[in-house]
């Protein structure tokens, strides 16, 4: 017989996001991944800034605390979110988690694409995310893989990300220290 547990000390969430590339270049010459601007010759098709890494983290964090998905909270049909920085969505998701008494313990993020090359930007991404979420960088793992030229990603038509977030129950529902947006 399965018994109900009132307060689960740890919770796990899984997130996924995918966006296609447009044939046109981005207006400012870069795309944004995990809050970091990366020079790239193609624009990401998206309603917001198209940051697939951050979108996957938002989805994982919302799922972790039973708050649905990024599309429920920030629908791409709502003009308020047009060109919005995805860091706003992540801070909102973190706020919802903290309001329920959960803090992010660690996360693992995989970005899937052929181009742009992600590995050179990972240290900057980890630093940005650690400052944004008020976490130690050692609790953050960001990596990149390709699809070995298979499928739409392999043909260079898009980019995807998978995220796993582990949260722990905390005694006080207060913001993590340093959880201001480092982009200003």
Curated annotation (Swiss-Prot):
It holds the Pfam family YgbB. Keywords: Isoprene biosynthesis, Lyase, Metal-binding. Binds 1 divalent metal cation per subunit. It catalyses: 4-CDP-2-C-methyl-D-erythritol 2-phosphate = 2-C-methyl-D-erythritol 2,4-cyclic diphosphate + CMP. One of its GO terms (biological process) is isopentenyl diphosphate biosynthetic process, methylerythritol 4-phosphate pathway. GO terms for molecular function: 2-C-methyl-D-erythritol 2,4-cyclodiphosphate synthase activity; metal ion binding. The keyword Lyase applies. Pathway: Isoprenoid biosynthesis; isopentenyl diphosphate biosynthesis via DXP pathway; isopentenyl diphosphate from 1-deoxy-D-xylulose 5-phosphate: step 4/6. PROSITE patterns: ISPF. The record marks 47, 146 as: Transition state stabilizer. A divalent metal cation binds at residues 17, 19, 55. InterPro entries: MECDP_synthase, MECDP_synthase_CS, MECDP_synthase_sf. Its cofactor is a divalent metal cation. 4-CDP-2-C-methyl-D-erythritol 2-phosphate binds at residues 17-19, 47-48, 74-78, 152, 155. Its EC number is 4.6.1.12. It is an enzyme of class 4 (lyase). Involved in the biosynthesis of isopentenyl diphosphate (IPP) and dimethylallyl diphosphate (DMAPP), two major building blocks of isoprenoid compounds. Catalyzes the conversion of 4-diphosphocytidyl-2-C-methyl-D-erythritol 2-phosphate (CDP-ME2P) to 2-C-methyl-D-erythritol 2,4-cyclodiphosphate (ME-CPP) with a corresponding release of cytidine 5-monophosphate (CMP). Belongs to the IspF family. Homotrimer. This is 2-C-methyl-D-erythritol 2,4-cyclodiphosphate synthase. It comes from Anaplasma marginale (strain St. Maries). The lineage of its organism: Bacteria, Pseudomonadati, Pseudomonadota, Alphaproteobacteria, Rickettsiales.
């Amino acid at each position: 017989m399965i018994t109900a547990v009132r307060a689960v000390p740890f919770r796990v969430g899984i997130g996924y996001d995918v966006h296609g590339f447009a044939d046109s270049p981005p207006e400012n010459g870069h795309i944004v991944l995990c809050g970091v601007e990366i020079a790239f010759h193609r624009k990401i098709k998206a309603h917001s800034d198209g940051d697939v890494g951050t979108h996957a983290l938002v989805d994982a964090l919302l799922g972790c605390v039973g708050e649905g998905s990024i599309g429920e909270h920030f629908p791409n049909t709502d003009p308020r979110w047009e060109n919005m920085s995805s860091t706003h969505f992540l801070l909102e998701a973190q706020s919802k988690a903290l309001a329920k008494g959960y803090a992010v313990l660690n996360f693992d993020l995989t970005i899937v694409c052929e181009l742009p090359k992600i590995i050179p930007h990972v240290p900057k991404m980890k630093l940005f995310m650690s400052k944004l979420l008020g976490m130690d960088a050692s609790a953050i793992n960001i990596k990149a893989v390709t699809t070995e030229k298979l499928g739409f990603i392999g043909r260079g038509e898009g980019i995807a990300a998978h995220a796993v977030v582990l949260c722990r129950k905390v005694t006080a529902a207060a913001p993590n220290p340093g959880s201001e947006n480092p982009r200003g």
